[in-house]
């Protein structure tokens, strides 16, 4: 039903109401709530408002508004004499929360969306990280022990070989020293022998000179 048709029906229904106070309320006052809010203290006014609701066939004006539209047509409520604010009108026109139907696309997307879990809550990651962080397996321990034993044997063999090489080098040096000493002693012996031979030759030369002089004196006589 259009807003102008509702306003005309309200104006026609207001003629059936008796005169109250200084004057009868207009149709816009009834729609905007001035008549209901200004005279709610009187019991007679309450009964008259119930008669008006019976004539209209609806307890509130909000039932005449089509909520299927994107925006409700509230042009017929525009009255300069109204005292209700836009917030109150929105409260009168807005549908109840129970009537709001969630969109199937949004709910389906929210249900189908997987819930993200933190890395700490994932059992797969924790189980995958646990072997590397935990103790090593017996096979790896045996291999590590075997590698350690091989390294130890290699170092011991290398040290033994170095000791033997150092011993051979020291022995060779000692042999060379002994050989040099023997050669030195031999040279010393030969030197002494040569010196003795030279001394003998000098002695013989002196004897030969003396004999030659003796022969010369005899020949001169």
UniProtKB/Swiss-Prot annotation:
Disruption phenotype: Leads to the loss of ochratoxin A (OTA) production and the down-regulation of the OTA biosynthetic genes. Produces greater lesions on grape berries and is more tolerant to oxidative stress. Residues 109-146 are annotated as: Disordered. GO terms for molecular function: DNA-binding transcription factor activity, RNA polymerase II-specific; RNA polymerase II cis-regulatory region sequence-specific DNA binding. This is Transcription factor otaR1. Induction: Expression is induced by sucrose, glucose and arabinose which repress the gal4 transcription factor, a negative regulator of the ochratoxin gene cluster. Residues 152-215 form the bZIP domain. Transcription factor; part of the gene cluster that mediates the biosynthesis of ochratoxin A (OTA), a mycotoxin demonstrated to have nephrotoxic, immunotoxic, genotoxic, neurotoxic, and teratogenic properties. Positively regulates the expression of the OTA biosynthetic genes and subsequent production of OTA. Probably binds to conserved 5'-ACGT-3' bZIP binding motifs found in multiple copies (3 to 4) in the promoters of the OTA biosynthetic genes. Residues 198-212 are annotated as: Leucine-zipper. Residues 152-192 are annotated as: Basic motif. It is found in: Nucleus. One of its GO terms (biological process) is regulation of DNA-templated transcription. InterPro entries: AP-1, bZIP, bZIP_sf. Transmembrane segments: none annotated. PROSITE patterns: BZIP, BZIP_BASIC. The gene is otaR1. Residues 127-139 have a biased composition (Polar residues). It comes from the Eukaryota.
């Amino acid at each position: 039903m259009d807003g102008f048709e509702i306003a005309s029906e309200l104006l026609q229904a207001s003629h059936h109401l008796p005169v109250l106070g200084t004057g009868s309320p207009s149709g816009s006052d009834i729609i905007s709530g001035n008549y209901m809010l200004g005279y709610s203290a009187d019991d007679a006014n309450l009964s008259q408002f119930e008669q008006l609701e019976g004539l209209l066939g609806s307890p509130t004006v909000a039932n005449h508004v089509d909520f299927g539209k994107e925006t409700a047509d509230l042009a017929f409520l525009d009255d300069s004499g109204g005292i209700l604010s836009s917030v109150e009108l929105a409260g009168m026109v807005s549908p109840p929360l129970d009537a709001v139907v969630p969109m199937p696309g949004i709910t389906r997307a929210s249900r189908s969306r997987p819930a993200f879990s933190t890395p700490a809550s994932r059992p797969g990651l924790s189980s995958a990280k646990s072997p590397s962080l935990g103790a090593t397996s017996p096979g790896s321990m045996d291999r590590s022990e075997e590698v350690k034993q091989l390294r130890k044997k290699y170092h011991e063999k290398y040290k033994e070989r170095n000791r033997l090489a150092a011993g051979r080098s020291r022995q060779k040096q000692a042999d060379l020293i002994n050989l040099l000493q023997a050669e030195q002693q031999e040279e010393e012996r030969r030197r002494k022998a040569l010196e003795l031979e030279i001394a003998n030759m000098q002695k013989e030369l002196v004897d030969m000179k003396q004999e030659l002089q003796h022969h010369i004196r005899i020949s001169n006589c």
